[in-house]
């Protein structure tokens, strides 16, 4: 087996391999860090490379922390009975991974999100690493594999649900019977696809 296969096998079941103990130690540190942190190199090299990461200029890895659970909406100032406050039992209709990608994109507005992957979770938080690309960097523009991201119609792609996590959340992994209301978009079908 090659190196990447060993890494992949270890991450498949973290609690049974050496990864579990490593994650315990890392998360003690990660909990004290800010929500969005730029890091030097990917934690899961096999996953990052499979999703398009290259160790060259123009690529940035960002670790993002997202709180688990449904969305708690802002509290009303006006009076009403607690059951009509409309605070709980609302889901954001997005995966936590998609939310993590958006957080990273807001922190680094000059970069575009390429993809992301899971790196850990505890009882309260999930952590994702987001692969980001600088579309204005000459190294990126001259690489035919990734030069497409510099085109203007890929600007702000994460906010339009064009990343892998975004497309999954919009139901675009499915086609045929049962997927009639997801194309051309959720909005075009008046939200019936959600």
UniProtKB/Swiss-Prot annotation:
InterPro entries: Rbsml_eL15_core_dom_sf, Ribosomal_eL15, Ribosomal_eL15_arc, Ribosomal_eL15_CS, Ribosomal_uL23/eL15/eS24_sf. Residues 177-194 have a biased composition (Basic and acidic residues). Residues 165-194 are annotated as: Disordered. Keywords: Ribonucleoprotein, Ribosomal protein. One of its GO terms (cellular component) is cytosolic large ribosomal subunit. It comes from the Archaea. One of its GO terms (molecular function) is structural constituent of ribosome. Residues 167-176 have a biased composition (Basic residues). GO terms for biological process: cytoplasmic translation. It holds the Pfam family Ribosomal_L15e. Belongs to the eukaryotic ribosomal protein eL15 family. Part of the 50S ribosomal subunit. HAMAP family: Ribosomal_eL15. This is Large ribosomal subunit protein eL15. It comes from Pyrococcus furiosus (strain ATCC 43587 / DSM 3638 / JCM 8422 / Vc1). The lineage of its organism: Archaea, Methanobacteriati, Methanobacteriota, Thermococci, Thermococcales.
